[in-house]
């Protein structure tokens, strides 16, 4: 009983729980703006309204995805009942009382997939009932009362997979009812009363198709006739239903009519079921409903009443039933009236046809007289005489056995004596895919990238699809199908091994081809043979064995003392890795390292090579004395001849212009270059004497230079040539100076290696040099010599074939300032000293006249088919760079011949040497030493109140090449190339003004500082600004994100890093900037519109400082740099023709070619080929030109390289670097990015005085330095630039992208204020605080410059005298360390009293000097205060308070074609006009 009593209680409790749950669920669904229908169950996006006796569809929330309305009393669905329910996925309407489905019943249900309508009372379905259900997959209509279906009922359901129509009352189905259901998988028509007669045969064919494909299941059972009741519709045949195809019993005949008559075309047919008669005119079905003149009689006859001209044409009768169709012969209705021009009755239509089939293009026309039909190709060319091509009697074009060549346009012409008309159509020949490139079996190493090439043709063009083992490829980033059809698998893994299938698919069919991939595991390199320590005699050849094994096959490289060895006349590396050294000399002694490297890892082994130099005489020893005398004489004669030619007249050709531009101005540089030339010329003369005496040819690469002369004679040659006399001995003892400031020549930056990065030292090498003879002969100097089976191409041919372009693509991101900063920076880093002579040493003839390769000439030959050759030019002027004495030897004895090295005239550091010079001599020439304010010299003052650079003095310069343009000389700056082009000159003007601006501010903040202190502090700030702009603003745009990651963050100074510029950087890599140069220098006014003088072609901007003076100053040029897009480097658009065809051009002369010069300079410097740098940068070795496709994707460029060089091992470095595809986000290719990131990392990390190195600047000062931007420099130092973009390297739209200069952050120089209690001696280079540290190394970095040492300290020199400096008193004290402290102090006091007396004397002298207001001009002549004098015809100078200010007259544009200079007059005049003005 107890158990029984608990039952009802439990049931009540359960009901209560369910009730609560129902309420809770209903509440859950009631979100703001989306109420749940009354009594419905709502949970999230599901709404269930079952068993609620609903008679209409309730309103539900738009986010509803499942709507359940089963078991209600809904009788009809109103159009729009489900509007806005775009998220609905499932709709359940079964078990209701719906009788019909109207049009638009399910509007807006575009995402509905499942629709349940079974067990209703549906009798009819509108043909548009299911329109809009594009996503519907399942439709359930079974157990209804449907009797008929419109054939278009299901045409709007492309994704329908399941359709249930069983248990309805369907008796007949119209053909085509299920035609559009391409995705059908299951169709049920069973349990209907299907009448299986001839009209249902279409359904039988459909069901058979389903069964054969296996993609769909279908059920349909015959109910009638009784004899086949219960049979599947799919099994019935036309024969058992007695169905007969139509057959024609009476055919129509041709007819001729006139206007307004009636014509009859007879057509009778029989068949079962009775066929339907359809009439066609010109292959188009006639509609009896649209034209009342047309009538179809009961027997099938066509009657046309009131005939018109438009009725003429080709008629045909078609009889059709479910068993088939048949057509009568074509008949013609001809219409006759008055003479009429031809009109087409049938125009040809575009027709698709398969290869091998036949095709007919119908064409007929009427007219009076009847027109003649003819056919041609679409371009009016006649049809080919081919038995396959015929014209039918009715005028159609018939082609049988169609081939692919028949594809194209055809024209039908109808002609009578009134007119002719034409109509065209295309025959589109469709063909199965055919493979043109098939994939090959590949064997690769794990981790590599493999390409399976697969290409096919066909019509339509096929699509390439790849599978592996019949299955789809893995969906990951490693598998990529390129647009060409190639399958690329990156980072191949072992499980990628297997069979791959390439399928070419089009609408006609598909073809398949297979390839197999075999993956081998990776193996770290293991040495098979290793070298051992070896001793050889000088002059011998030695082979060092080294080979290794591994997977992938390791690449063998050799290093000597940290520099990679490359293939040359000196070194040869065999395929297995053995290193052969030819003509071993003492310079070859050292440690050699063999490195085996693959993608898995690397292994290395080293050995020591010792060279034994026997004390025996050599063949060249007897000729040393005569050769050195002859060498000195011939070199000096050639140099003097060149000097006379260049400096005693104006430049007459681009050759003169280039030579004058590159000629070193510093006397020390000239002497050092001269010594190197004499040293090398002596060896060449000795070689010639030995060769003549032995009567053998020693000019090949097999000649042993170390057998030429004995070591003691080699040292004698070095002494007599002047090499040892100009060997610098640096002095870095003045640590008070060197810890704070840079020397001008870059010495003592690295205190462990003081010459690292110094000016006038040899370029560094990443790879060993490559010379034909291993010593000094460039590659390609012998045009008949083969390299890897091919001759090297002429540099000019490479330029015209590969590099030069007239097309320029603007850079969408960066301005032309990106290029200009790169050039300005380059002139801070490197400048090669070229030969001092333009004439060959052997006979003194000019290099451009003889076109030979005799030293120092190395002419750029012009190919026979070149445009310049047609004008008679044989070569372009080129002389070799001057060699370093002994080629980089640093010991006191030169006992071996070293490969030729070149001189970097500048300091390697980013230290603003382009502003201040790279030697003490250069620095003093541009300083304003008279004012004692630490300023740089300034030139004429413009209307803006800001000065230009001072003019250079001396003989005629490159800027005065055309006396008809202007007599204005070159500007003087820290780098002698400042006048090369006007954009560069503008940058030099900016930074010279920036120095003077900062120096003026520092003097205001620290009036107690002397001129030297202000100068060096300002120079330090300016150098830091250039460093910051370069690394923070410019380099990220050049290197991109990838390159900046390679460069890495700054972690402090590393004294073990040599910051020197490596030769390949200066000669090839950093010359990539030439590809960024625009052919125009834009000049814009303050509204960023062209100035009156317009933009300037680049060839008119070379050496033209007069344009800055006379044509608006520097502002228009600067706006043209930051206001105009730069040139984008496109692999097919490299150097514009202003640089390759008009470089330094002058009237009636052959201009130079910068691209050809770059290539020739690389060979001159022994730069290894591109392939060696690929290996250095860890790129794959390129044995074929196809191996370059990852870095040079353009096949046309690879083909050009192949035609030019023949072998990848021959490609010069510069052209290869500039044709590499850009790494995304950068302006460099991968090899170029490697080289630049390597160099800039060394420049930063190997610079002890780098601005970010702790202690160089105080934290507060460093914070201010980091406010620097080039935009701020422009605002502060341009003439009147007031609006710029914040980043002048990025393209901005004017005016919206430009802001006021007031918004650009500036450097606050107040943090440089020297806060001191007694400032009388602070900041004085000659003050007491500096006395004890001495200034010996400041002025005398080299031992030979130091005056003779005296036993007593010298007197403090006069401020005005040069060449005298304080002695280092600390060294004097150290020699008396054993004296007592009392004596030391007494001597100290006596010395201090003497120092004070000397200082007073100097102050009196200085006051006396400053009290005079006379001026001394550049010629040493004195002028009284407030006097004026003419310096030349155009320049008037004035003496004002001891300062000389000169003004240059600006000449107006000449009004005649040929103005003439008159002696004593500044501006050219027009003589003709003067003559006219005379009475």
UniProtKB/Swiss-Prot annotation:
Homotrimer; disulfide-linked. The homotrimer form is predominant. Homooligomer; disulfide-linked. Oligomerization occurs intracellularly before C-terminal proteolytic cleavage. Interacts with PXDNL; this interaction inhibits the peroxidase activity of PXDN. Residues 1413-1471 form the VWFC domain. This is Peroxidasin homolog. InterPro entries: Cys-rich_flank_reg_C (IPR000483), Haem_peroxidase_animal (IPR019791), Haem_peroxidase_sf (IPR010255), Haem_peroxidase_sf_animal (IPR037120), Ig-like_dom (IPR007110), Ig-like_dom_sf (IPR036179), Ig-like_fold (IPR013783), Ig_I-set (IPR013098). Changing residue 823 to W: Loss of peroxidase activity. Does not affect oligomerization. Loss of peroxidase activity. Does not support the formation of collagen IV cross-links. Reduces the proteolytic processing. Loss of collagen IV cross-link. Catalyzes the two-electron oxidation of bromide by hydrogen peroxide and generates hypobromite as a reactive intermediate which mediates the formation of sulfilimine cross-links between methionine and hydroxylysine residues within an uncross-linked collagen IV/COL4A1 NC1 hexamer. In turns, directly contributes to the collagen IV network-dependent fibronectin/FN and laminin assembly, which is required for full extracellular matrix (ECM)-mediated signaling. GO terms for molecular function: extracellular matrix structural constituent; heme binding; interleukin-1 receptor antagonist activity; lactoperoxidase activity; laminin-1 binding; metal ion binding; oxidoreductase activity, acting on peroxide as acceptor; peroxidase activity. Induction: By TGFB1 in fibroblasts and up-regulated in apoptotic cells. The keyword Heme applies.
